[in-house]
Amino acid sequence: MGLQMSHELPVPPAAAADPKAVEIARIWASGGAQHVSLATEIWDDPAAWGLMLVDLARHVANGYEQAQGRDREDVLRRIRTGFDAEWKSPTDVATGGLVE
């Protein structure tokens, strides 16, 4: 059984209602760094993670639009700018290993 955190986000209703739903990623901000837990075995082709990341960016843009009234396309452009900048000149190095 995992640690229950007070700052944990809620499970989306559709996922909670689906007995076949699988969590694929968790990301925490802690101590000035990101810490992740990933279900890397979920897809055979790593390109599927690229599709998921684009879908995630769209969900983030929708969230900014709904919560702050920001233009969805502007938000997506800012996300892409940040993604491209980090890809070109990483500000951090991914470390760590698989934890079971």
Task: Put a short name on every predicted segment.
Residues 2-100:
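Solvent-exposed interaction surfaces and binding hotspots enriched for charged
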